[in-house]
A protein has these predicted regions:
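Conserved class I S-adenosyl-L-methionine
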Residues: 1-40, 42-51, 133-155
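A conserved beta-strand element that flanks and buttresses the S-adenosyl-L-methionine
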Residues: 104
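Short catalytic micro-motifs in class I SAM-dependent methyltransferases
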Residues: 107-108
Length: 166
């Protein structure tokens, strides 16, 4: 799938994103609890792949920036959370150089074309003290996730790239 096709996929999903997340609220509530545990209030936080901005708004950070390569997701985030900053940006072609205490990549890795390039680009927004928090679901959940999708409890996702253990 090309980058343009991925952007279109997420642009098309932007309008229903929050309703879709509400259907899997247990998963997202657990993630939010984890993020509250590891990210102190008043930290500076960069969320890459911020979607409609719900997580960033919940973290109550002193400085927060959300990046997403989908213009429609970014517009939805700005509309829903006007007190926060959101930008259209791609981690694989990152241009910002502002440094953050925490960088969050929630359920993003599998959607990246070049994971290693993305990791290299993180050096532009991190210091040696920055904590990078990456979440992804365990592939052991795949049968249940597929069943939930077939039952209409989960929306369609892109095919994920997986990292090999070598």
């Amino acid at each position: 799938m090309t980058k343009e096709e991925k952007i279109k996929f997420f642009d098309d999903a932007a309008a229903s994103r929050d309703a879709r997340r509400a259907r899997s609220r247990y998963y997202h509530r657990e993630l939010l609890s984890f993020f509250h545990f590891v990210i102190p209030k008043n930290s500076s936080v960069l969320e890459i792949g911020s979607g409609t901005g719900g997580l960033l708004a919940e973290l109550k950070s002193a400085k927060a920036l959300g990046l997403d390569f989908s213009p429609a997701m970014t517009t939805a985030a700005k509309t829903a959370h006007p007190a926060f900053n959101f930008m259209i940006a791609d981690i694989e072609a990152l241009e910002i150089t502002e440094k953050f205490d925490y960088v969050v990549m929630q359920d993003l890795l599998g959607n990246l074309d070049d994971i290693w390039l993305s990791f290299r680009n993180l050096s532009r927004v991190t210091t040696p003290e920055t904590r990078v928090i990456i979440t992804t679901y365990n592939p052991l959940w795949e049968p249940l996730v597929m069943l939930a999708g077939a039952a209409g409890l989960k929306g369609r996702d892109l095919r994920q790239n997986w990292l090999a253990i070598a």
